[in-house]
Amino acid sequence: MSQDQQQQQQFNANNLAGNVQNINLNAPAYDPAVQSYIPNTAQAFVPSAQPYIPGQQEQQFGQYGQQQQNYNQGGYNNYNNRGGYSNNRGGYNNSNRGGYSNYNSYNTNSNQGGYSNYNNNYANNSYNNNNNYNNNYNQGYNNYNSQPQGQDQQQETGSGQMSLEDYQKQQKESLNKLNTKPKKVLKLNLNSSTVKAPIVTKKKEEEPVNQESKTEEPAKEEIKNQEPAEAENKVEEESKVEAPTAAKPVSESEFPASTPKTEAKASKEVAAAAAALKKEVSQAKKESNVTNADALVKEQEEQIDASIVNDMFGGKDHMSIIFMGHVDAGKSTMGGNLLFLTGAVDKRTVEKYEREAKDAGRQGWYLSWIMDTNKEERNDGKTIEVGKSYFETDKRRYTILDAPGHKLYISEMIGGASQADVGVLVISSRKGEYEAGFERGGQSREHAILAKTQGVNKLVVVINKMDDPTVNWSKERYEECTTKLAMYLKGVGYQKGDVLFMPVSGYTGAGLKERVSQKDAPWYNGPSLLEYLDSMPLAVRKINDPFMLPISSKMKDLGTVIEGKIESGHVKKGQNLLVMPNKTQVEVTTIYNETEAEADSAFCGEQVRLRLRGIEEEDLSAGYVLSSINHPVKTVTRFEAQIAIVELKSILSTGFSCVMHVHTAIEEVTFTQLLHNLQKGTNRRSKKAPAFAKQGMKIIAVLETTEPVCIESYDDYPQLGRFTLRDQGQTIAIGKVTKLL
């Protein structure tokens, strides 16, 4: 055979081998000129591949619809397309350069492409959203990140041909790798309730940084792996978590699991995400702390130290005392004499009143005219409105509240008692007058009950008119009066240590400022009235609590002026407050203290007058409450209360209506439900609701008012949570608010 024939035969053999190679799927032709695109090239190294071009990854998904259109034209099942539809290799027509005639053979050897490994990794690599695409792409798309091992190795051999021995060796190595235990893949399951992973929302500023890191990854791998034989297959897990209520994805992380380095990198990414989240939380806490700190500083600036208040008034605290008792018991006379003895009224003024009273035929009433400034009160000799006067001693500042004793003006007495700290119950020892005031229907008994109900827990019982010729400082008469009173006051609720009895003479002043002379009453060695009041302990003043002032009266004097006692907190000139229940915001323009002088501030326990801006006088009413804006007083129409029935001729049942007096407010109230009956002695609640209530019973009931009323729970603010019920001109029950409904 000639040399030319041998060359021709060798050429034909080579040509035949090339044709077989093109037809056989086991060794498809490799064309270096065609760029091989492999998804996520950071995990699959191809020596002959061109450097990764940014934006090509978006083409992987952006041309999905176009690739699906070519699927029917080529008649080629896409799930066998060399590891997934993403491996386009420049287009569908170019990816099958060997033709379609051996399509079945191609499918039978598809294990070379790594589809057996697909079944092993399916559980871990499932995309979970593959139903959004055509079912024909379920397998290929879920495993698009698993580059077939056989194809990588074939491409690594370059453009040369592969012998049968090399193919068998390659297939054996592929099977051995497929049979090995898959490496653990680092997973981040954000939907699991048992795995606590940081959920980080990617900021827009961070996205370009992440893309650059992914773009630089192939170059790093190419530098590291210079020899094709050292290339390793990398398996990545991409987890996309989309919150159902969020407008943007919560997290998107890639975790390669081929080497410890990639695992460490993933751990660093998680740690970085956790650090970012921790930084955001700490920043939020810091801002919150700054806000809270500013609010705290502002609140501390508004708070007043009690020592500062004492220094403002020379260390003297304030006390409001109310003179109460039956009509003609001598209340106004005693109050006027106290003002004269303490220097609040000068001698010249008293002499003037004495001359005027003598001319009017009321010679013995001149001291009462100091308190009764109204002409009608002076003519009739009885107090109609609650008179207010101010005096000082060496230890304290006092406001006298002179309550009317007549039963027609009991409402005014209740309003005055609600503003008092200490009660002075004036009892006339003159024969006939004591019996009229203390027996049934007398105002001495009712005033004692009303004082207790309105929070007057300290009571001084002064037996007045001991200088009267019918008494003449008699010890027997004094003991007769005090014995009956002590038993009655104990039944009302006063403890033994809360009540003090003393004999006085309001007209002569004996026992008011100085002690009773031993010549007149050798049997009494107790203190005088002012001596006892100066030494009496007072309740703690809550000057830094929310401001509350029940309005007792109103007037128009160059604006709207209201008057009342500050029950809680303090007020400053220029401060904004809220009038409840009409929720009107007002500004305090002027503050007048007890001496009618202007002041910059006023504190809990003081009787003040405030000029307000922002509201008209006709929009106010007695019983409204001036409170702080941040903590306004509660306004309700229904509430639950504990009620003790003191005097009731008939029975009380659901639907019963009466008049309620609470602080300075007067409202009509109706019993809507009787809940429990309280057992005597233990106050244990009955399981069955009572059908009615009568005198002497204690019950829990639900009351409803016709108009909104400003009240608080008795446990929170006792001065705004106690009330009195009156019907047909008499007090029938007392109570306290237990729950607001």
Swiss-Prot record:
Compositional bias annotation for Basic and acidic residues: 166-175, 202-241
Annotated Gene Ontology cellular component terms: cytoplasm
Modified residues (Phosphothreonine): 399
Location of region: G5: 505-507
Source superkingdom: Eukaryota
Region (Several sort of repeats): 5-135
InterPro entries linked: EFTu-like_2 (IPR004161), G_TR_CS (IPR031157), GTP-eEF1A_C (IPR054696), P-loop_NTPase (IPR027417), Sup35 (IPR003285), T_Tr_GTP-bd_dom (IPR000795), TRAFAC_GTPase_members (IPR050100), Transl_B-barrel_sf (IPR009000)
Gene Ontology terms, MF aspect: GTP binding; GTPase activity; translation release factor activity
Location of the region described as G3 in the Swiss-Prot/TrEMBL record: 402-405
Keyword GTP-binding: yes
Cellular compartments annotated: Cytoplasm
Region (G1): 325-332
Residues covered by the tr-type G domain: 316-541
Region (Disordered): 59-186, 199-264
Keyword entries, A-Z: Cytoplasm, GTP-binding, Nucleotide-binding, Phosphoprotein, Protein biosynthesis, Repeat
Residues binding GTP: 325-332, 402-406, 464-467
Annotated GO biological process: nuclear-transcribed mRNA catabolic process, deadenylation-dependent decay
Annotated stretches, region: Charged: 162-311
Region (G4): 464-467
Region described as G2: spans on this chain: 381-385
Function, as annotated: Involved in translation termination. Stimulates the activity of ERF1. Binds guanine nucleotides.
Protein family: Belongs to the TRAFAC class translation factor GTPase superfamily. Classic translation factor GTPase family. ERF3 subfamily.
The protein, known as: Eukaryotic peptide chain release factor GTP-binding subunit
Lineage, top ranks: Eukaryota, Fungi, Dikarya, Ascomycota, Saccharomycotina
Gene from which this protein is expressed: SUP2
